[in-house]
C-alpha cells in the first residue's frame, strides 16, 4: 500500500504537512521539498504520476527511500505526487472511502467510538471527500 501526497494544488488535502512544515502556507514548495520532508520523518518515498502510479522505470518496492541523497536524485520534475511505501515505513493507513456509494465515514465513526488510537490519529481529507487515517 502507498500513500499519495499530492502536489501544490492539493496541499489542503494534506494538512499534516501543511501545519507541520509550511506554517501559514505562505512558503512555496516543490514535490522534492515535500519528499525530503517526508523522508526526514522516516518515510520511504518515491515519485508518482498523475494517476498515482510509479513513474515509468521506477521499481518503487526497491527504490523507495528515506535517504536524502537518493530522494534528491529521483525524477521529481516528471512527477505529479509523492508516494510513501507504507510497508517499509511501518505505517498503516485506514482509507474511509465515500465514492461509489461506499459508507467509509460511517464505518470510521464506529471505529472511532471503539478505539482511542483511531480517534487521535493524524488524518487528511481525500479529494473525493473521504479520509485517510495514519496509524
Predicted regions and their residues:
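Conserved phosphate/metal-binding and DNA-contacting active-site motifs used
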Residues: 2-135
Amino acid at each position: 500500500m502507498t500513500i499519495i501526497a499530492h502536489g501544490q494544488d492539493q496541499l489542503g488535502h494534506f494538512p499534516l504537512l501543511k501545519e507541520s512544515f509550511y506554517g501559514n502556507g505562505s512558503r512555496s514548495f516543490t514535490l522534492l521539498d515535500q519528499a525530503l520532508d517526508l523522508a526526514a520523518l522516516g518515510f520511504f518515498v518515491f515519485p508518482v504520476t498523475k494517476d498515482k502510479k510509479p513513474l515509468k522505470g521506477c521499481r518503487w518496492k526497491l527504490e523507495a527511500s528515506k535517504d536524502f541523497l537518493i530522494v534528491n536524485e529521483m525524477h521529481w520534475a516528471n512527477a505529479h505526487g509523492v508516494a510513501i511505501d507504507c510497508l517499509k515505513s511501518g505505517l498503516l493507513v485506514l482509507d474511509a472511502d465515500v465514492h461509489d456509494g461506499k459508507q467509509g465515514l460511517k464505518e470510521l465513526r464506529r471505529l472511532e467510538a471503539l478505539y482511542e488510537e483511531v480517534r487521535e490519529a493524524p488524518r487528511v481529507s481525500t479529494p473525493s471527500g473521504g479520509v485517510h487515517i495514519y496509524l
